[in-house]
Amino acid sequence: MDILGEIVNVDEYVEKLELQKNDIGFYKCPFCDYTNADAKVVRKHVKSKHLEEIEKELKKLESQKSKNNGKKQTGQKKQGKGKKQPKRVRETCVSTQERKDYVLFFCHNHKVRLHLANGEVLEGKCCCKDPYTVLVDVGKGDVVIVNKAYIVKYVPLDLEKL
C-alpha cells in the first residue's frame, strides 16, 4: 500500500488510500474482496469495516517514522524543480585556454596549409578568432571561411614566427 504525505488520523489515511480497479472497472477494497463502481463507497466501506487494520497500518507508519527520526530512507533522492537552466553562450572571441583546438589560435595571422575533409588543400594567411570557423586569405583578395570540423590537418608554413 502506498500512502502519500504525512498521515495523522484514520480519515486522512482513508482519503489518501490508493484504490485499485479490477478488470471490469470497479474499485476493489485493499483488505477484502468488496468491489464497487464508486470510489467513495469503497472508502466508506474501508473506514467502517476495516478500522482495526487501518489502526495497525498507522502504528506501523508511526514506528517507521520514529525509527528514522523524520529522515529520508536511504536511496531516496531529492526531486528536481522543473527544467534545467540553459548554459550561457560565451562571446565568439575565445581565449586559448578554453578550447581544445587552441593550436589554431597560435596560427592567427600566420601562413598555414590546411588539408580539408573533402581532399582540398588551402594555403594562405589564417585568421582564427571564432571558435567554430577559420578565415583563410588565399590571396588576390579571396577569403575562404572553413568550419574547424572539416579541417583534417594543418601545417604552419612560417615556423620561425610561431
UniProtKB/Swiss-Prot annotation:
Residue stretches of biased makeup (Basic residues): 68-87
Record-stated family: To M.jannaschii MJECS06.
Key words of the record: Metal-binding, Plasmid, Zinc, Zinc-finger
Positions of the UniProt region annotated as Disordered: 60-93
Protein name: Uncharacterized protein MJECL27
Zn finger (C2H2-type) start-end: 29-50
Molecular-function GO term, any one: zinc ion binding
Superkingdom of source: Archaea
Organism: Methanocaldococcus jannaschii (strain ATCC 43067 / DSM 2661 / JAL-1 / JCM 10045 / NBRC 100440) (Methanococcus jannaschii)
